[in-house]
């Protein structure tokens, strides 16, 4: 058998299907090969760089609303010596248009975190004066009130305020001001002073778009109910301080100036420390009455004041700095009390004033001194009233008098004058904005503290406001404070200057600086005003220039003259207590006091001089012998035995038995024991004034003709 190989027509033979399969496999392989690719090593890194670039482009293209911080610098040029003005930081800062009209309109909220105030001096070396400046963190003050911080005109200076000092901790709306700096110079208007350079750092957040033009009005939505107006709440709390000089506690003290006082200021939920003005309401050589000013914003306010008067002193030198070394007591006169008055256009109404005091125990001893002459430890008060302020104004608070004499000095004694810090009591003033229909300011009378007693106080719930209105042009430093002559429905006038009380009842006049008081009513009201200035008294003729004149006696003088005979059976304090218990009015208390005074005066017709003491028989016999025959002959023997004398047979020789009394001694014989004690104490502090008072003193009512004819022989 042989094998046949066909080489010609392959496609036509049995090998054709196999060839087709090979061709299809070759074509399929050619189609798959182009899909397979080798990736270059650098391509993934290029792709990541492109993604990073995209992220940066997205971050810069889409704002996220974050805040920013900017710094602004502006100047106030061409200042003269007596320049004055203010910087109000916020939308009212007209001295910096870039801040006011620029970036501030592009944000909803801002806060100034730092203020650098620099004064660049341009004055000549011969110029004098300074520029005082003050920070107002709440934009409540319209004029400079504190002169503590100053720039010298010839030197210049700088002051930095941080966020906590300028109310810059919290964010503020871009439409409200944050704080204010006020300044005022005391130089000449013709002298060039320099300029201010101010640098502020501002933080901003929540940007907004401001096109500068008003948008077209949109359809008005359905009106919503008007929210109730927020009632503001303001409080002042603090202890006024005063520097005094004292030496020994049996000597008088010297008072320094009051100046500015520092107290805590609370408004709604915010609080900080602020300064307010204080000065003396009146001052004399015997006492000084302090006065404090408090700001009142525009509106109607209900004011409640709590005063706890206590005057401890403390040392100002090491090693006992700040330690208590005694106190200054209060007088027991009814002319000393806490009271309020109007200032700067405010109107006070519905005044309610309750004053109390605490007496010292007679056996209480402080620095070897006792409380046996009516000195008081404390004087407290609770005062409430309504005040209406058409614009921002002030009212003032008057405290009890600070006594300067040794009678009220309970400090440690030193050999020389030393400075002491004295507290004037705790004062709390609360202002609650009063809106109609809210029922605010419903006052409930507080009961007196344990051991305290009510006293006469200015009290007129439905009457006119207080009449004390000190003005800048009125010299209030030289006159004495007026006592209130109107008895309230709580207490009487007992113990006042005109009531014949202990030492405070004496009326003294020593020229302009006088402690005398007088009755005064103004415009039909019962409120005391500041007395008008008086001319100095004419010089007195030395020697015995006293004259005896008849005058209408008063009930108080009669009671002091003979307390046993002119006692009506009940005191003025009893009238006050009965009026309080019966809830009587002012008229009821006044009528009862007038009736009591008439009862005292009616007793003058039955008054008789005190009967003479019984005379012993021996003295009566000598008097009868002297009338019948003169004493002649005999001697007074020094060595004679007791009871043996040669009167009647001897003579008196040599010397005088009794010297002639001086005019001053005869005047002193007319004083009562209480007046003599007061005179001796007053003579230690001011001998010339004590002598003048002695020669001007008028004797009590002349109910006995013998005393009227012979005033220098004293009482029998």
Swiss-Prot record:
Keyword Chloroplast: no
Bias type Basic residues, positions: 18-30, 44-61
Record field: compositional bias (Low complexity): 1-17, 645-655
Cellular component terms per the entry's GO annotation: host cell periplasmic space; host cell plasmodesma; viral capsid
This protein's record includes keyword Lyase: no
InterPro entries registered for this protein in UniProt: Luteo_coat (IPR001517), PLrV_ORF5 (IPR002929), Viral_coat (IPR029053)
Region (Involved in the efficient long distance movement of the virus and the periplasmic subcellular location): 694-698
A GO molecular-function descriptor: structural molecule activity
Domain of life where this protein originates: Viruses
Family: Belongs to the luteoviruses readthrough protein family.
Protein name: Readthrough protein P3-RTD
Naturally occurring in which organism (per UniProt): Potato leafroll virus (strain Potato/Scotland/strain 1/1984) (PLrV)
């Amino acid at each position: 058998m042989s094998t046949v190989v066909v080489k010609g027509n392959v496609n036509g033979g049995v090998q054709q299907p196999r060839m087709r399969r090979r061709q299809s496999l070759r074509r399929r392989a050619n189609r798959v090969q182009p899909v397979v690719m080798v990736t270059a090593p650098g391509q993934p890194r290029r792709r990541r760089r492109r993604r990073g670039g995209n992220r940066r482009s997205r971050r810069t293209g889409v704002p996220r609303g974050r805040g920013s911080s900017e710094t602004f610098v502006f100047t106030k040029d061409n200042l003269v010596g007596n320049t004055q003005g203010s910087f109000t930081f916020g939308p009212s800062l007209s001295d910096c248009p870039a801040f006011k009209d620029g970036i501030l309109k592009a944000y909803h909220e801002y806060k100034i975190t730092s203020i650098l105030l620099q004064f660049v001096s341009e004055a000549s070396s011969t110029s004098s004066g300074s520029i005082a400046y003050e920070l107002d963190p709440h934009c409540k003050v319209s004029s400079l009130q504190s002169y503590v911080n100053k720039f010298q005109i010839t030197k210049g200076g700088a002051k930095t305020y941080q966020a906590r000092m300028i109310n810059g901790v919290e964010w503020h709306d871009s439409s409200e001001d944050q704080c204010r700096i006020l300044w005022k110079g005391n130089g000449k208007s013709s002298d060039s002073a320099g300029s201010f350079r101010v640098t502020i750092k501002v933080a901003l957040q929540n940007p907004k778009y401001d096109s500068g033009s008003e948008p077209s009005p949109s359809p008005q939505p359905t009106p919503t109910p008007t929210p109730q107006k927020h009632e503001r709440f303001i409080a002042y709390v603090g202890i006024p301080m005063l520097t005094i000089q004292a030496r020994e506690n049996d000597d008088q003290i010297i008072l320094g100036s009051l100046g500015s006082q520092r107290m805590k200021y609370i408004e709604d939920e915010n609080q900080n420390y602020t300064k307010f003005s204080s000065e003396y309401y009146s001052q004399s050589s015997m006492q000084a009455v302090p006065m404090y000013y408090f700001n009142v914003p525009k509106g109607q306010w209900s004011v409640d004041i709590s005063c706890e008067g206590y005057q401890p002193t403390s040392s100002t030198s090491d090693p006992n700095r700040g330690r208590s070394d005694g106190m200054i007591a209060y007088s027991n006169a009814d002319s000393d009390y806490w009271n309020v008055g109007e200032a700067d256009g405010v109107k006070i109404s519905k005044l309610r004033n309750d004053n109390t005091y605490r007496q010292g125990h007679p056996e209480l001893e402080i620095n070897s001194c006792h409380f046996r002459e009516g000195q008081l430890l404390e004087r407290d008060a609770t005062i409430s009233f309504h005040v209406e302020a058409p614009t921002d104004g002030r009212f003032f608070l008057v405290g009890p008098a600070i006594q300067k004499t040794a009678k009220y000095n309970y400090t440690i004694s030193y050999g020389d004058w030393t400075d002491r810090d004295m507290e004037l009591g705790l004062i709390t003033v609360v202002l609650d904005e009063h809106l109609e229909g809210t029922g605010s300011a419903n006052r409930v009378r507080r009961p007196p503290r344990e051991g305290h007693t009510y006293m006469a106080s200015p009290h007129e719930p439905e009457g006119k406001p207080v009449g004390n209105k000190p003005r800048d042009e009125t010299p209030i430093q030289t006159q004495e404070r007026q006592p209130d002559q109107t008895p309230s429905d709580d207490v009487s006038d007992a113990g006042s200057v005109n009531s014949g009380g202990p030492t405070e009842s004496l009326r003294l006049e020593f020229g302009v600086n006088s402690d005398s008081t007088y009755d005064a009513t103004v415009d039909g009201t019962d409120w005391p005003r500041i007395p008008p200035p008086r001319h100095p008294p004419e010089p007195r003729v030395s020697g015995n220039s006293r004259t005896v004149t008849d005058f209408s006696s008063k009930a108080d003088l009669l009671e002091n003259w003979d307390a046993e005979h002119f006692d009506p059976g009940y005191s003025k304090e009893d009238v006050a207590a009965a009026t309080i218990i019966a809830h009587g009015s002012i008229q009821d208390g006044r009528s009862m006091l007038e009736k009591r005074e008439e009862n005292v005066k009616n007793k003058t017709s039955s008054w008789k001089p005190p009967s003479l003491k019984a005379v012993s028989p021996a003295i009566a016999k000598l008097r009868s012998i002297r009338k019948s025959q003169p004493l002649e002959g005999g001697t007074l023997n020094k060595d004679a035995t007791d009871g043996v004398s040669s009167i009647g047979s001897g003579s008196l020789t040599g010397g005088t038995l009794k010297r002639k009394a001086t005019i001053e001694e005869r005047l002193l014989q007319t004083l009562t024991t209480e007046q003599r004690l007061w005179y001796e104490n007053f003579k230690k502090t001011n001998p010339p004034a004590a002598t003048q008072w002695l020669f001007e003193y008028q004797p009590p009512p002349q109910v006995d003709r013998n005393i009227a004819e012979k005033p220098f022989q004293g009482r029998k």
